[in-house]
Amino acid sequence: MIRFVDANLGRWLRHLLFVLIRSYYALFFNVSCSGKHLLQDQPGTLILATHVSRHDGPLIAALLYSTKRIRPTVHYHEYYNWSQFLPMFIASAIPMSSPKSWPDEKRKARKAVVLKIVHKVLAKGNSVLLFPAGKVRREEREKVPAYLSGVHDILRAEPETPVMLLRLDGLGKFQDAAYDSFWTFLGIKKGRRHVAMDLRPLRDLDPSMAVEAFNARLEDLLNEPISHEL
């Protein structure tokens, strides 16, 4: 029954939600996105993104919605927060973690279930948005702790999975802020904040590496600055 509702009513609600979100962000952010067209011809892609602010998930999902169906991953507690049920349901979000209070065996079983869902989504040709750092950046450099093995586990199980790196600039607390003149007709000098989104294929991640070395390499890639050279 849930699948039937999602396939019919959910499709319309999803489209309406993302149109509203995209319109909202267009009022406050002037976003440029490079490489978005590459995603359209690459089904079943794992998108690894920097996590610079709480706006990342909805902004990315809304901007890429018309290009490819994106299933965002979210924290367990965020997913099961009753106040966020509707957007989580409409966006078909995937809860990636589990409460630390759970026994180890229960957490391992939960992780296996989540990884199975991710692989099923990718096999259907949909893309999965994942933030390797696991939380919003609280310092200038993106950190990918060695104990977060989700990306490593996904690619080790399916090494041929297409991977794309998504970096955001201008949106986070520790990034430079620049504004356009969108609101000057109202006498407001500070307009929309300029945000750069860069999406490119990633072919040099080796899942055969130990998870510590793998995460260190991924961390370096996430922290590479976006080139704005013409």
Q: Where are the regions that the model predicts?
A:
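Short hydrophobic helices that act as membrane-entry/anchoring signals
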Residues: R3, A7-F29, Q84, M88-S92
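A cross-family acyltransferase "interaction/gating" segment
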Residues: R138-E212
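Short beta-alpha junction loops
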Residues: Y76-Y79, G134, R167-G172
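Helix-to-loop junction immediately C-terminal to a conserved catalytic motif
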Residues: I21-S53
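Residue-level preference for the first positions of well-ordered beta-strands
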Residues: G44-L46, G125-F131, P162-M164
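Short glycine-rich anion-binding loops that position phosphate/pyrophosphate groups of nucleotides
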Residues: V52-S53, A133-V136
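Glycine-rich anion/phosphate-binding loops
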Residues: K106-V114
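Catalytic core of membrane glycerolipid acyltransferases/transacylases, capturing the structured
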Residues: D41-R107
